[in-house]
Amino acid sequence: RRIARQEQSDWPALSADIRAICAGLEPELGQGNTAGARFYRQHGLPGARGEALSGFATLTDFALPAYQQAFAATANRTHALRYVFLTLLAHNGDTNVVKRGGIEALDWLQGRARHILADPAARRQPEALYAALQTLDAQCTEKNLSTGGSADLLALTIWLTEYPNLLGTSYEPT
């Protein structure tokens, strides 16, 4: 609403608005027979509804700081977004992954992503990160894993970085 009305806003205010709008969804988190509800009951994974309830805390806590770090290191938007995706894979409880491969697959994927992120070259060297992501993609394909939840969060991150006034900074090279 704030953007449609061309009101000044920032990400913390939008995140708070999202939390307020979604507050009524909390009782629904573990109800129903959807995969997301089942994974919430079994593993405490909040899925898309839980992410919205939190005002997209995964973006605030992980994706946006990762974008800032990688962009500052390289001034390369594509590289920064790849770094964000890897960061999301490491920290998001992606229920798409769990649906395809079980909680063990999520543990494996998060471990692989964290291993890649632990290499300093991942943040500073676009070629090294791209090669690591290609390898990880091939492994996920072999295991029939879909990282759709993390991809959705990446899409929201891309949208947010198109509106630097929302984040209080510009991410484009000077």
Could you say what each language-model-derived stretch is?
Residues 1-138, 142, 161-174:
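Phosphate-rich cofactor/ligand-interacting catalytic cores and adjacent structured alpha/beta frameworks
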Residues 143-158:
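Conserved phosphate/anionic-ligand binding catalytic regions in large, soluble enzymes, centered on
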